Design a protein with these regions (language model features):
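Catalytic cores of histone-lysine modification enzymes
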Residues: 1-109, 114
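Residue-level marker of positions within ordered structural domains that often coincide
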Residues: 99, 132-135, 312
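Short, conserved secondary-structure segments in the cores of folded domains
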Residues: 117-120
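Short, charged beta-turn/beta-strand-edge "cap" motif at the junction between a beta-strand
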Residues: 122, 132-140
């Protein structure tokens, strides 16, 4: 577990600058700090906890212990069909191998017991290793974040998540942020020769009052006040499916092109951050006698390469799409700035 990024030294974390793992790691560490303080507050009034855990001199519980608890669970929990996340003795110690290298699968039998089944056509020699898959479709960032490694056979980052923010000069910005019930960003997924994307949040950035989006304060039957979003006078019940509403609009092609323009600008911004820190990462002293372990440096370099490849592919792919869709729609886009929401 020592290679999980939550255990990396500050100098090692700096190697992740420009990758999608950097903000995810910062958010995770902040979350773990809050959880640890909540644990302290909830238990410090218990005499034995105050003495054994939190005593300033003899207390044995430290933040690193909470990191260990998180790592045990995050790197070993498996999602069992119909049950959810579980830690199963022995099975949770099996190593990962994807594709044809996966020797066994984990299932739940008729009695609700966790079982490990050899895959059809597979054999395991005596004293051989039984491997499972942690998820063949998981991206490089998630694999490094959750398990502390990237498969040698992985040739693509597979997917990545880029955050977005509603621009500060958006007149409806505060209202949009208040009603948004979706992740603030979008996911890019490699799909054959192309790249697909998904993210409801981007549509909040792409439309405004002049398009038909508005907000009103409404009183509920309980007497409370709540903010209600409407699209062309029709209520919007959550923005996860807002795209399907926009697709029915005569100006759908305009909204779609706006979204792709925002997406492309955000990808360009991420590439700039990634390439802008390359020299610093390359020059970082690593190995024995330094603050950067050899393995951490190589993992960071590998992630940077894989994510840059996918970002470059996505930028080129959507540049072609923007050029193809622009033209007759350029006049409609004139007043829309695609750098909105881009960091």
């Amino acid at each position: 577990m020592e290679m999980l990024p939550t255990f990396w030294a500050p100098a090692e974390c700096d190697l992740l600058t420009g990758t999608t793992l950097a903000p995810a790691l910062t958010a995770k560490l902040n979350s773990l700090n809050r959880e640890f303080e909540q644990l302290r507050e909830a238990t410090s009034s218990l005499p034995w906890c105050a003495e054994q855990w939190w005593d300033e001199v003899d207390g044995i519980l430290e933040f690193d212990d909470w990191l260990q608890v998180d790592a045990f669970y995050r790197s070993r929990a498996l999602e069992y069909p119909g049950v959810g996340d579980c830690m199963v003795p022995c099975i949770d110690m099996a190593n990962h191998s994807s594709g044809t290298g996966t020797a066994a699968i984990y299932e739940v039998d008729d009695q609700g017991n966790a079982v490990l089944l050899l895959r059809d056509g597979k054999t395991v020699e005596e004293n051989g290793e039984i491997t499972i898959t942690y998820g063949d479709k998981k991206g490089a960032c998630e694999m490094l974040f959750s398990y502390g490694f990237i498969e040698d056979e992985m040739e693509s980052a597979r997917e990545l998540f880029l955050d977005l923010s509603i621009p500060g000069d958006d007149p409806l910005g505060r209202a949009k942020a208040a009603v948004a019930n979706c992740a603030p960003g979008f996911k890019i997924v490699e799909s054959g020769d192309g790249v697909s994307w998904d993210g409801a949040y981007i549509w909040l950035i792409c439309v405004n009052e002049e398009d038909g989006l508005s907000f009103q304060i409404q009183q509920t039957v309980e007497g409370n006040r709540e903010l209600i979003a409407t699209w062309k006078d029709e209520p919007v019940h959550g923005f996860e499916d807002f795209r399907s509403i926009l697709e029915q609009d005569p100006l759908w092609d305009v909204y779609h092109l706006r979204a792709v323009s925002v997406l492309q600008e955000r990808i360009a911004s991420q590439l700039q951050d990634l390439y802008g820190s390359d020299d610093q990462v390359d020059a970082a002293q690593h190995g024995d006698g330094t603050n950067i372990r050899e393995r951490a440096w190589h993992l960071a370099k590998r992630l940077r390469f894989l994510e840059s490849e996918l970002l470059e592919k996505a930028y080129s792919y959507y540049e072609d799409e923007v050029s193809w869709r622009r033209g007759p729609l350029s006049e409609d886009l004139h007043s829309f700035r695609p750098d909105h929401g881009v960091h």
